[in-house]
Amino acid sequence: MADIKSYRPESSSVGSGQVLQCAYRADKARLVLREMADALALDLFERGLVTDQLVLTVGYDVESLSGPDAQSRYHGAVTTDRYGRRTPKPAHGSENLGAPTASVRQITQAASALFDRVVDPALLVRRIYLTANHTLPREQAAQTEYRQLDFFSDEAQTQAEQLQLARERRMQEAILTIRHKYGKNAIVRAMSFQDGATARQRNGQIGGHRA
């Protein structure tokens, strides 16, 4: 797996991409996507940014069209890679978050829902790109959100959500403090110990290579 250094989202976006070391089943690729969403949310939080939209692009492996049952397994669009090999057309979609956020919970849930909506579970995944669109400073978003809440929100529900987001922000601050002091692998999610996870390996790399 390697970082996609040539990937350049639009100026108001923050994103990352991975090329997996081998073809991943959709369930394992979803795990990697959740790790990426978690890292993206922390990156946004550290930069003082929020986003209101996620964009996902998933590239399939050529092995998805190999084998005797390939024709019965896939009937969608096909494209050709740079080596002239036939591959399923990449999956692509976006998910609106409702309000600007850098919440790990909200971003991970939205990314997972987006993956489930656009990715064909019968195909093998090789590349994953996740982007946070329409990013802007947290303070700027808070001013706009406050005006909207005054007019449209249920007060009790809004207060409960704000309390939960405040707890999340304190947790994100604590995670970043620990990682800055002891390294990114000093504190990781339980999902990153599952088979197929890549975050711990990526945390030990600099510029796409092992540190």
PLM regions with names:
Residues 1-211:
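Basic, low-complexity intrinsically disordered segments
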